[in-house]
């Protein structure tokens, strides 16, 4: 009986400590990234969101509805303001198309165009094209522990494992308990800071902790950054196949 008890308990201990290393039980960076990806991951999701863009000449709001399937398919329709209403974007793998109702044209966004701002915000088309799974793009190392928003965080240094990537490295602050990224600095290959993200609010949606208010800042641009609000989110939603087609851009 004693041997049977050992056989049952030992695998449980291995499972509980699989992501830990060192005397102080510091988690491995790659294990933390995996947990972050698990928290955000979903086969399908539908979201409505509002961007508040704080530019040199004032602030403006842009509202959108976003359909996401897996890691490489998304469809975005802009709902407001009237000037942007009806603009749509489709991402399929490493390709991105945009439809403009004012010109009734669909164009493919590629090359240097990917670095351009989305709707004048601090986010680029390149940001939208990123693989949402960090572990697919970076290796991670825990470099410290800090508090952010009164939450204890692991501080991670992420280094790119791919050549064709917008940000060679990142520094991220991950909530120890909820496995949510609360703060992030993004760097060029030479170490120059390019963009920052600060999460202002986290909410539990469908048993997942999700940032619902964040401030993005392109440090190379003037202005006070872009606030991003998640107004609603449905995980594992039913999404018709036609949504992820070029024909849907003109509907």
PLM features per residue range, with description:
Residues 18-26:
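Bacterial Sec-dependent signal peptides at the C-terminal "C-region" and cleavage site
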Residues 101-129:
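Acidic/charged, solvent-exposed loop-and-adjacent secondary-structure segments enriched in E/D, K/R, S/T
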Residues 121-159:
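Short, conserved active-site entrance elements at the starts or edges of catalytic domains
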Residues 27-102:
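N-terminal mature ectodomain segment of secretory-pathway/periplasmic proteins
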Residues 129, 149-246:
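Gly/Pro-enriched, hydrophobic low-complexity segments
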Residues 1-10:
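Bacterial N-terminal signal peptides that target proteins for export
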Residues 47, 74-78, 96-100, 106-108, ...:
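Short hydrophobic/aromatic-rich beta-strand segments that constitute the beta-sheet cores
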